Amino acid sequence: SNRRVYCIQKDKTGYMWFLTHEGIDRYNGKEFKRYKLMDGDAEVNSLLNLNWLYIDQEGVLWEIGKKGKVFRYDQIHDCFSLVYKLPMESFSEQPDPVTYAWLDQNKHIWLCNKDTIFLYNTDTKQVTHIKNDISEEITDIEQIDESHFFIGTEMGIHYAQLENNALKLINCDKLESVKAQVSDLHFDKKIRKLFIGTFLRGIMVYDMNTKSVIRPDYNLKDISITRFKPLNDKELLIATDGGGVHKINMDTYQIVPEIVADYNLSLI
């Protein structure tokens, strides 16, 4: 695929799925197949409809856009089906009512904006409206357990509990002291540490065991962090915007380059 790629997922068969500016491509190891997203007879190909790609715990692939349309991959018919869309008449002044979408471990798709969180239950297909008491644009979410979450925003990070269809903010002085635009979060349940990637403020770590925020000595503070990915039991890969790929030791917090490019465009 030579198209611009926004998201990549690998399914249980081993196929690679790429969300691009023209739709969804699947690579089976030999060839690419393109999938169109259809709303009735109309193809959904606006960039406001091609934003997030997730695979749930049962291996089902989901695509979500900023206009609030949710597509589910139908393996039997080998196509994507539109299963839900936000009523756009409620957002006549907002062309993109969803600023962030996320799939949790409780079979809920979160459709978030500054005022409201819409929870779409992938089993029952019911939608619950929850007031966003954070009143900030959500940029990433990590689930701690059945009902507790770390929520990153354009202003910082919050600790919250989702219970009885309400999002309750829980005071955490150390986390509230983190004032930065959060770009990515990674929570390791085994060691109970939250790795926080930011826009031009580097990397921070919140240790739930000691209730402290650690700032590594070398923390890539002049580089924007785009993604964390586990490398092994002890290390995380760190993708950056323009600074190559690094890795961090989750015990010592030492950060070292993993993949960087030289001026001859070769990899080191």
Task: Label every PLM stretch briefly.
Residues 1-268:
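Carboxylate-rich, polar loop motifs that coordinate divalent cations or form catalytic acidic clusters
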